[in-house]
Amino acid sequence: MNIAVYISGHGFGHLAQMAPVLNRLHRIRPDISFLLRCALPEQEMRSRLHFPFEREASPVDVGVVQKNAVEEDRHASIKLMRAWIEQMDAQIDKEIALLRAFNPALILSDISPLAFPVAKALGIPGIGLATLDWHSIYSYWLDADDPIITTLASAYAQCDLLLTPPMAMHMPVFATQQQIPLIFTQANSVANPVATDTRKKALVLFGGCGNPPYHLHALQEMHEWLFLVPDMEQDPSTNLPGNVQPVRFASDLRPVDLMPHVDVVLCKPGYGILSECWTTETPIAWVERPDFPEFPMLKEWLDNAFPACGMSRADFQQGHWQVALDAARIHPTPFPEYEDGAIKAADIILSYGS
């Protein structure tokens, strides 16, 4: 059995959703061959996917242009999306030719709009898995009759079934939807790299877009905290504050593996990080993303369901993190109970491929 999988290259959250489902499918049916259509770094993909796969790495969507991890560029996003949809028919034709050679039984997508017209053309099921889609995102920015909106609506309307985990946006363009439990990356047991440090510990995470700018040396004022920070391209001539420790992630040490060893995760709100905090029961200090249409829905979860506290982008940039960190660490709200949505999703997908 062959399955083609389209994964958005907008950050790591779409891969974080799809990977547990694909791993589950491989465990149930090790005979499945996967073709992944995804432009994310191969190292990141192989750190999350525990099986061999074919890959074609050209982009499968535009997503949203980020000025940095917590600030979106609406004008640049619309300009890029407008150019992309003008070539969409030609791109669909290329995808059809590619997949005819692969001969898939079905297509999965999170949440490239190319996948569903291709599935229809090949006469096979097209299944979506997502907590957001680009039609819903751009509908906040553009009129309903804009060519971007109508083109995306036409593509997504060809989806046979959309699977939606918790924390999903309202996505009315998909006619048939089914809710599933939480999809998450399971933490591996790793040695605690900061076990002997008695300070409170914060893991600073901003996903695939890297760290947004902030006043690094202001962190030394929070002397009771140790900050674990990845993606630090530090000038060797510049001294780091004594309470900042760089972290290098690899296949044997992922962000979720460190979460059980810290007191708080400081992050932008996004599905991947929030689901990992949920399952490791790690409190969340979050930075606002007011320009991104998904943010209000995620904020409802942060305000009402999680031990979490937010801060403005200005406070983050100036290094004024203390209030949010301390409030999140002692927040009385427990994380909700959860079930493994990858099991449910895999069973549904296999029922379409049989």
Where do the PLM segments sit?
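Conserved nucleotide-sugar phosphate-binding/catalytic loop shared by glycosyltransferases and other
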Residues: G9, I32-E86
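A nucleotide-sugar donor-handling region in carbohydrate enzymes
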Residues: Y138-N211, D231-E233, L253
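C-terminal amphipathic helix plus adjacent low-complexity
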Residues: Q322-S354
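Donor-nucleotide binding loops and adjacent catalytic segments primarily
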Residues: L22, T185-V264
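Conserved nucleotide-sugar donor-interacting segment of glycosyltransferase catalytic cores
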Residues: K94-A153
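A donor-sugar binding/catalytic signature common to diverse glycosyltransferases
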Residues: L106-D110, R254-M297
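Short amphipathic alpha-helix
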Residues: L15-H26
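Nucleotide-sugar donor-binding patch of glycosyltransferase catalytic domains
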Residues: R248-F249, P283-A327
